[in-house]
C-alpha cells in the first residue's frame, strides 16, 4: 500500500498564492464588496475569503473562475504584473519598481481606495501634479 507523505498531502500556499490573494483583495475592495458578499457569491464563508486573500489557502481554477465572475474581471487579472521571479513577490522584482508593503496595504485599505478613486477622477494633469506636490509636502511634516 502506498503511503502519502504528510508534507505533500496538503499543498502549502506559496508566493503565487499570496500574490493572487492580494489581487483578489484589491479587486474586491475596488468593487466595494465585503468579504461576506464575495463569499456568498461564490458559495463560501467570509473566513474562507479571508484565507484566499491572505494566501493561506490556495484558490483552485474553478473557484478562481467564480471569483472572477463575481468581481467582473477575467481570471488573468489575478496574475497581471506578477514578477517573473515568484520568490521576489512582496519584495519587488528586479525589473519592477519596489513598492513597500505598507504602501500596498494602504492602497488596499478603505481610505486608500477612496483616495485613489478621487484622484483618478481628476482629469487635469497640472491639477494632479499639484495634488501630488501638496501630499508630498504634507507627508514631510510631523503632525
Swiss-Prot record:
Keyword annotations: DNA-binding, Plasmid, Transcription, Transcription regulation
PROSITE patterns assigned to the protein according to its UniProt record, in alphabetical order: HTH_CROC1 (PS50943)
Pfam families: HTH_3
UniProt xrefs under SMART domains: HTH_XRE
Coiled coil feature spans: none
Identification of the protein by name: Uncharacterized HTH-type transcriptional regulator y4aM
Presence of the UniProt keyword Cytoplasm in the record: no
Keyword Transcription applies: yes
DNA-binding region location: 35-54
One term of GO molecular function: DNA binding
Residues covered by the HTH cro/C1-type domain: 24-78
Amino acid at each position: 500500500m502506498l503511503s502519502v507523505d504528510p508534507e505533500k498531502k496538503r499543498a502549502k500556499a506559496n508566493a503565487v498564492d499570496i500574490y493572487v490573494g492580494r489581487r483578489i483583495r484589491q479587486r474586491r475592495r475596488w468593487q466595494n464588496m465585503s468579504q461576506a458578499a464575495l463569499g456568498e457569491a461564490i458559495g463560501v464563508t467570509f473566513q474562507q475569503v479571508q484565507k484566499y486573500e491572505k494566501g493561506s489557502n490556495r484558490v483552485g481554477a474553478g473557484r478562481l473562475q467564480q471569483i472572477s465572475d463575481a468581481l467582473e474581471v477575467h481570471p488573468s487579472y489575478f496574475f497581471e504584473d506578477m514578477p517573473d521571479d515568484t520568490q521576489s513577490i512582496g519584495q519587488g522584482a528586479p525589473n519592477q519598481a519596489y513598492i513597500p508593503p505598507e504602501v500596498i496595504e494602504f492602497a488596499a485599505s478603505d481610505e486608500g481606495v477612496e483616495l485613489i478613486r478621487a484622484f483618478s477622477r481628476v482629469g487635469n494633469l497640472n491639477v494632479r501634479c499639484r495634488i501630488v506636490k501638496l501630499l508630498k509636502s504634507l507627508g514631510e511634516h510631523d503632525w
